[in-house]
Amino acid sequence: MKGIARLVTSLSRIGGRKVVSGTSTVTSSSSSSLLLSRRSLFISATNLLNSRTKDSALPSLNSSLLAQKWNFLGGQRRTMFIQTQSTPNPSSLMFYPGKPVMEVGSADFPNVRSALGSPLAKSIYSIDGVVRVFFGSDFVTVTKSDDVSWDILKPEIFAAVMDFYSSGQPLFLDSQAAAAKDTAISEDDSETVAMIKELLETRIRPAVQDDGGDIEYCGFDPESGIVKLRMQGACSGCPSSSVTLKSGIENMLMHYVSEVKGVEQEFDGEDEEGTLSGEMRVE
């Protein structure tokens, strides 16, 4: 009904306009056609109302359509509205299922072996062309190889995500496995390390996660002043990751923590075998 009301309103506005350089014949014709349109609209609406009053078939049809839609969505749960978002890395894409993914922290799966502990990550890895999977709070970042098009991968990833959420399976087979609290401040941390972790958690990590990735704190060498970090998700392998690391993260850490002299990136090649449960981090 709102659409019809807008249509009638727009027609009224058009009919009420005066044409300065027109003739009376044109104005009369426009008014006549407008009245005819209104009359036809009124007759059509009246006939529709009468048919609803005399025959209950139309309401029954509407109810059955709503029931089928409700059963389709609520019973089988086979329909999801999944959104995608590009990242600075052209090989990575963020998928938003409209449902929470990680309740706490994030999880990175740099290889197939690391994805064996997660049914969703394992399912996505079974798609040809997928080389990395990352879980955020409400998104899944998928990284592909250069020789595969997103036009081919996206429908398969959509299906994998939809099948997972309709299956009722847990995100992880073992929720306690590999829960590395990399930025959690412990009693053994020095004041410098505590400041580094706080900056990573409150200032740097949120910005990196907006681009579909994350960072992992790997350590700090007090003698050299070097902070070691590992880029994850879309940030891993991104052409601009080195610029982000140096111009963004390094400058911020050096500005707020005088003991920091530089930042170095750790690469996944050093841990190629991975772990059965993935690199899951609890924040």
Swiss-Prot record:
InterPro entries: FSCA_dom_sf, Nfu/NifU_N, Nfu/NifU_N_sf, NIF_FeS_clus_asmbl_NifU_C. Predominantly expressed in roots. One of its GO terms (cellular component) is cytosol. Residues 1-48 form a transit peptide. Keywords: Mitochondrion, Transit peptide. It holds the Pfam family NifU. It is found in: Mitochondrion. One of its GO terms (biological process) is iron-sulfur cluster assembly. Its main location: mitochondrion. GO terms for molecular function: iron ion binding; iron-sulfur cluster binding; structural molecule activity. Belongs to the NifU family. Molecular scaffold for [Fe-S] cluster assembly of mitochondrial iron-sulfur proteins. This is NifU-like protein 4, mitochondrial. It comes from Arabidopsis thaliana. The gene is NIFU4.
